[in-house]
């Protein structure tokens, strides 16, 4: 498990992100991300969220920070944190189908754009966190992130 220093002074758990990529294409450089077990989605800066969805055929913005994409999308979103790349399962880029009777139709994206609570660039909720082992050490003010075994 990779141990990193908590970047937040506000009581959140935050990490320094080296880069964010969709498949092998970088969509964001160095930034900070809050790791939030109470959030389902990923909240990204608008420019990064637009780059992610522009690279997915059939993806569309709803004009209010949300996006839709084909439920058949198999792109992988990766976050490089302290030199270690953590890649999400492609299914976790899909939050939910718009029509539960059509699982091959349009899905709501697990990535939206917006402002985060402490000014961090990203907020990584369950869509990301279910792809890593995540541990916190409040005494040492450190965060552990580990890769899941297949």
Regions found by a protein language model. Give the residues of each.
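Active-site or ligand-binding cleft "flap/edge" segments
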Residues: 1-150
